[in-house]
Amino acid sequence: MAPPSIFAEVPQAQPVLVFKLTADFREDPDP
């Protein structure tokens, strides 16, 4: 089984990626 440290890092990385994607999408001018 993977250590708790890595297991805790996974759920934290997901929200960060989603937030970055949404931020880039908002910054991008809509056609």
UniProtKB/Swiss-Prot annotation:
The keyword Ribosomal protein does not apply. Its EC number is 2.6.1.1, 2.6.1.3. Its cofactor is pyridoxal 5'-phosphate. Keywords: Amino-acid biosynthesis, Aminotransferase, Cytoplasm, Pyridoxal phosphate, Transferase. It is an enzyme of class 2 (transferase). GO terms for biological process: amino acid biosynthetic process; glycerol biosynthetic process. It comes from the Eukaryota. The keyword Zinc does not apply. Biosynthesis of L-glutamate from L-aspartate or L-cysteine. Important regulator of levels of glutamate, the major excitatory neurotransmitter of the vertebrate central nervous system. Acts as a scavenger of glutamate in brain neuroprotection. The aspartate aminotransferase activity is involved in hepatic glucose synthesis during development and in adipocyte glyceroneogenesis. Using L-cysteine as substrate, regulates levels of mercaptopyruvate, an important source of hydrogen sulfide. Mercaptopyruvate is converted into H(2)S via the action of 3-mercaptopyruvate sulfurtransferase (3MST). Homodimer. In eukaryotes there are cytoplasmic, mitochondrial and chloroplastic isozymes. This is Aspartate aminotransferase, cytoplasmic. It comes from Oryctolagus cuniculus.
